[in-house]
Amino acid sequence: MSFSPQLVNLGNYLAGEFDNREQALGEPIWFVHLRLWQRPVDLFSDDSITLFAEQANIVNLDRPYRQRILRLMPAPDSETGLYVQYYMPKNPSALIGAGRHPDLLKTLTPQQLELLPGCVLSVSQQTVAPNSYQFTASPLPNTCCTFSYLENTVQVSLGFAVTETELHTYDKGIDQETGKATWGAIVGPYRYTKREQY
């Protein structure tokens, strides 16, 4: 299947190695210096572009966390719309370090992933210059992204905005009782700069 230019651009913009060095130096109280890897993987390739993502504190690059899969797809009810479906590895520890060592991803199969039904983002595209775009991903209305991790139920709010060189992430953990953010982009997005294209 051939992919739309919008889907190809979104995949290219999201694929790469990123960090938020400038933000962490400018606002060290609020933002840890992180490295984020988003590697293309050969899954669901008949209708999607799929990425493996994980991140690490810059001082602990050997201890990455938040392993996840982003499946970028055309929206079923739209000729131009896109959306992102999140998955979680059933055994995240088997993929620790795959951002830096992509050979670990070669044997990954769909059967090793858990679909996260409420963890879906709708993507809109805005032209910012000729052949240059910004994609903004927001949760679908009336959805709640929850999943089990280490025998706990976790709720997160997801979202991002990406251009060819920058990625802003709005992911944050939510306390299910109070509805308040407990970790992540509490005072604003993490502002990453792409350092390497994958």
Swiss-Prot record:
Which PANTHER family has this protein been placed in?
Answer: CHROMOPHORE LYASE CRL, CHLOROPLASTIC (PTHR35137:SF1)
Would you tell me the protein name for this molecule? Phycocyanobilin lyase CpcT homolog
Tell me the HAMAP family matching this sequence. Chrphore_lyase_CpxT
Write out the similarity annotation: Belongs to the CpcT/CpeT biliprotein lyase family.
**UniProtKB keywords:** Lyase
Role summary: Covalently attaches a chromophore to Cys residue(s) of phycobiliproteins. In vitro is not seen to act as a chromophore lyase for ApcA1, ApcA2, ApcB, ApcD, ApcF, CpcB or PecB, the lyase activity is therefore unsure.
Q: Which domain of life is it from?
A: Bacteria
The keyword Cytoplasm is assigned to this record: no
The induction comment states:
Induced by nitrogen starvation.
Annotated CDD domains: CpcT
Q: Would the keyword Lyase be found if you checked this record's keyword annotation? A: yes
